[in-house]
Amino acid sequence: MNNYFLKDLNKEQQKAVLQTEGPIIILAGAGSGKTRVLTYKVMYLINEKNTNPLNILMVTFTNKAANEMKERVRKMGASPTIATFHSLCAKILRIEGKYIDLLPQFAIYDTQDSLDVIKEAMKRLDISVKDYKPSSILASISSAKNELVSESEYLRYARGNFQEKVAKIYPVYQKILSQNHALDFDDLLLKTVFLFEEN
């Protein structure tokens, strides 16, 4: 790699760019150059290690970060896959979801859509939204999904009145989503994990 690439980086950043064997973690505050390091690392892999850009996957949490990485990497002439965790999982599920009985044209429900489904599930179960906040129910289901706890597993762990209500609502919520050929944001991650585990 020409030195002009590295001159913009401090010694620690240069080490991160040049290390290609084994895992590496970059911990730093906002605005400290993490995205720059990743961008330069991609260019190093492509230009110096002859890595095919199609074999590089960059994943981040936010659309803003993904778009920033895409812009920087493309300015440097590369085109690896850059995505958020959710968009990557959605793409995988649209292609391979058939193995877990998902149609490729599933809808992705945002928070408001999900709250509407929670309210519908509560209505079907005759559980009052005055007694239990739909947003709290949704937050509990979201937490369960982030821990990879399915609706059937949640029932086994439910303790106390609130969790027992969530345990009743969770499967009805999932059933409504399924009937609508929809996934919520947490399902994108959860279903992808299940897909990989089962196949």
Where do the protein language model's features map onto the residues?
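A basic/glycine-biased coupling hinge at the interface between accessory DNA-binding modules
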Residues: N3-Y4, E21-P23, M43-N199
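Conserved RecA-like helicase ATPase core segment
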Residues: N2-D8, K34, Y40
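Glycine-rich phosphate-binding loop at the start of an alpha helix
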Residues: N10, T39, D186
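Small-residue (primarily alanine) positions within well-ordered alpha-helices
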Residues: A16, A28-A30, M58, A65-A66
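Pre-Walker A adenine-sensing motif
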Residues: K7-L18
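Walker A/P-loop
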Residues: E21-Y40
